[in-house]
Design a protein with these regions (language model features):
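ATP/NTP-dependent adenylation/nucleotidyl-transfer catalytic domains that generate, transfer
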Residues: 1-137
Length: 137
């Protein structure tokens, strides 16, 4: 299991692999809209917010430990084409959903963390899945 990889990065990597390798399985994956764990009648960006905004909120709030107010300011500057009231709604929704789902991080399986996001001290102190020397083999 890979962890700490934003959806926008995953989609970029899949596009790159499809373009450079042409794997048919990747084309099938890209035909299906990306999305989080949602009810059957829900879809990702329509239900939440644009993934580029979601990834920014996630990085700023969880990674940089910014307050919701600061996240709102930065996201509004990052995406000037999105109305400020819409940004406020996105950030408010993100923070609420994030705090409601933090238990998923505790229950998640041991994973290879690609990014450096550290959500909680207890999980961060677990032994790493791989060590640096394993990457050189």
């Amino acid at each position: 299991v890979l962890a700490n990889v934003p959806k926008t990065v995953v989609m970029y990597l899949l596009d790159y692999l499809l373009e450079t390798r042409g794997y048919p399985g990747i084309a099938a994956v890209l035909k299906k809209p990306a999305g989080p764990e949602l009810a059957p009648n829900q879809s990702g960006e329509e239900e939440l917010m644009p993934f580029k905004v979601l990834d920014a909120c996630f990085y700023l709030f969880a990674g940089e430990k910014m307050t919701p107010e600061d996240v709102e300011i930065v996201v509004a500057e990052m995406f000037p084409d999105i109305a400020r009231k819409t940004v406020e709604g996105y950030v408010e929704k993100f923070v609420r959903l994030f705090l409601q789902s933090i238990y998923k991080w505790v229950q998640s399986p041991l994973s290879l963390h690609i990014g450096n996001l550290d959500l909680e001290r207890e999980r961060a102190l677990q032994l790493p899945v791989v060590t640096s020397s394993e990457w050189t083999r």
